[in-house]
Amino acid sequence: MELITKKRLHLISGRSNLPLAKEIAEHLGVELAQPNLAEFANGEVHCRFSESVRGGDVFIIQSHSASEGMTINDSIMEQLIMVDAARRASAKRITVVCPFYGYARQDRKSEGREPITARLLATLFIAAGVNRMISVDLHSGQIQGFFEKPVDHLTAMPVLVDYMRTLGDDLVVISPDTGRVKVAERYASELAADLAIVHKRRVKNKKNVVESKDVM
């Protein structure tokens, strides 16, 4: 009897960071599956996988970033569409790989009548059929709790520390605000470097504008 081997690992990428996906595929020794993404004249996105993913372990890679003429929202929606396609194609398990997780800064209500969009995004992924999420250095660890499925929260710290060590011995690690002090402390400890903290406040009613108050 002839044995038929079926491909179990399917690595699929959206368009926001295709070079990264290609490097991952090369490192794993696998080929990127083709989602055949296309845009209609009205901007809607369509995809259809070139190969069967039935019973397979599907990883869908997409950074939620603005690139290649895409907005963050475009990147997110494109990934959701691919997740839905994989689920409807009977994939056994679907893992979304989000090197940069969109809307991560909106992880709480800082004022009344605001959304918690990082939680909303997690809800959308779960509703689409995601079984697991992988991300790198989330804005805050609490985002892991927004998912009802497992989250692998990776860190690029070892890679960055190795690079920083090539910059010299007289280093100072600066935390841009009090919220990142613990992270800065970890880097300073690994590098045996000094630590500085910037105390700042945001200018009310002005987007992306801050005032630096003190450096400690």
Feature names for model-found ranges:
Residues 1-216:
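PRPP-associated nucleotide enzymes
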